[in-house]
């Protein structure tokens, strides 16, 4: 898929959306009118020159651009003079059951929001479509509300991933003692590893949401917007609690499975021991009479 930039412009009484393909020619992005909020969503943009050209009107620091071009960033929030920079991660399960991740970045200013995503997973596509179908829901809203919608979408995406994760946990739990030929231990280990990856992201993301909800020096978020952000923070806490419960279940399944395998092996060893005891006299007699002697005075 080709790189693209999706633009949404709105004010109290205007609304427009534009799409630009990011090829060799630099796109001519529409300039917002006075009083308009400008949301630019970048998908798969890896060209430093294109980013610098597009972000120049917003005064974005070169270190922020460097972070955006990076594929791996821990969730964090940084306060610059006229905008906030937020780094996050999202996950999705492939058809093969592999947990893949993608970087998401947000730059939130007074009258603009810039969002960045490497893979075209459609994280914010539904939000753009809802805006297009019902513009009244966003008309007149400030950038704080738009940023809340994006952050809430990120958290909602985690609920989808966690539901899939829990479904996999339940499936393995049901087949724990049934399918002896499958790679149960390998599946449990993958679930344990997935839980570690998700938790490693959700913990710092919790700190990001907490700062957004309580810090008074973030002038972009104030008043009613902090109420929405506290809701996002609460949802993040729910995710962590649910993930911890699922992780404990996975660890219990591993202990139970290993104990089951150990008991089964002990049972097999007992059977082999009984068989050995039964056949040992026969083996001794066969060994004695099978020796190459003409005369055996002892007998």
Regions found by a protein language model. Name each.
Residues 234-299:
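Hydrophobic alpha-helical transmembrane segments and their immediately adjacent juxtamembrane loops
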Residues 1-222, 231-244:
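Peripheral, non-transmembrane regulatory/ligand-interaction domains of membrane transport proteins
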Residues 178-179, 227, 248, 252:
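Non-transmembrane, extramembrane segments of multi-pass ion/lipid transporters
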């Amino acid at each position: 898929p080709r790189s693209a930039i999706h633009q949404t412009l709105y004010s109290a009484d205007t609304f427009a959306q534009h799409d630009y393909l990011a090829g060799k020619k630099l796109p001519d992005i529409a300039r917002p009118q006075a009083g308009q909020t400008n949301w630019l969503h970048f998908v798969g943009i890896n060209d430093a020159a294109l980013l610098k050209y597009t972000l120049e009107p917003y005064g974005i620091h070169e270190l922020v651009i460097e972070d955006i071009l990076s594929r791996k960033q821990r969730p964090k929030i940084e306060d610059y003079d006229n905008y906030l920079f937020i780094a996050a991660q999202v996950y999705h399960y492939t058809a093969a059951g592999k947990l893949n991740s993608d970087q998401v970045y947000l730059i939130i200013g007074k009258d603009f929001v810039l969002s960045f995503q490497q893979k075209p997973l459609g994280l914010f596509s539904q939000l753009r479509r809802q805006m297009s179908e019902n513009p009244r829901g966003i008309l007149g809203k400030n950038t704080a509300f738009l940023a809340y919608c994006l952050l809430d979408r990120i958290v909602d995406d985690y609920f989808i991933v966690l539901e899939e994760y829990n479904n996999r946990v339940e499936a393995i739990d049901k087949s724990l003692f049934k399918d002896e030929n499958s790679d149960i231990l390998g599946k449990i280990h993958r679930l344990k590893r997935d839980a570690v990856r998700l938790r490693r992201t959700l913990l710092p993301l919790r700190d990001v949401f907490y700062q957004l909800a309580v810090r008074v020096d973030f002038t972009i978020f104030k008043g009613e917007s902090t109420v929405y952000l506290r809701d996002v923070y609460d949802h993040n806490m729910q995710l962590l609690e649910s993930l911890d419960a699922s992780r404990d279940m996975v660890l219990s399944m591993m202990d139970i499975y290993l104990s089951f395998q150990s008991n089964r092996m002990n049972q097999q060893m007992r059977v082999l021991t009984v068989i050995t005891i039964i056949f040992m006299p026969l083996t001794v007699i066969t060994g004695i009479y099978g020796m190459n002697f003409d005369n055996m005075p002892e007998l």
